[in-house]
Amino acid sequence: MPRHAPIPTPRPAPTKDVFGAAAKEVLDTAQRYLSNPVRHVVISPGSETVWDDCCGGTLYVRVVSVSPVTQANAALGTCALLGWTVTMALGTVRCASAIDSQGRAPKDKDLTEDALYLTQDAADLGQMLMCETNAANVSWAPQGPDGGCMSGEWQFDLRVGACACPETR
């Protein structure tokens, strides 16, 4: 376990994790909208999600970036924070048809079925984003297929409120 530098006193009171809370809320809501079940439901760390068990299906959300929204006169003082713009990605990982053990390519009907499975996920999650969140700058993109897996994810911005500036203890 890495050791961390001591925190000087006085120090700010702990801050509520509004980014993680927003990700969890999006994920919980998205589960209710999916037409096709998934085995895994995760908040993914980092810039990508794991494709290891794609045939079980994965619903994921990840935080892509965070930017402060400040008052126009932010340079004049401290605590000019109005909120945060949290860019997130919400998607699914699914099984995709692949070359079989005898080197034969997947059949057309199987590839079409795969594509329609993914576009159904896109429709379900897109509907959720438009009906249940304040999402802006919303776009969907497929990924893969690769190694028998495929994915599609929505990227979008959420406006998350800011807490009052912390007081020192």
Residue ranges and their predicted role:
Residues 1-80:
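Small/polar-rich, solvent-exposed N-terminal microdomains that initiate assembly or binding
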Residues 5, 100-115:
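A solvent-exposed, charged loop/short amphipathic helix patch at secondary-structure junctions
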Residues 31-40, 51, 111-164:
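Acidic-leaning, charged glycine-interspersed low-complexity segments
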Residues 57-58, 82, 134, 152, ...:
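General secretory precursor processing signal
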Residues 77, 81-84, 109:
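Short, solvent-exposed segments of well-ordered alpha helices
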Residues 82-97, 150-162:
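Oligomerization/assembly interface segments of phage tail-like spikes and tubes
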Residues 95-103, 167:
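Short, solvent-exposed secondary-structure capping/transition elements
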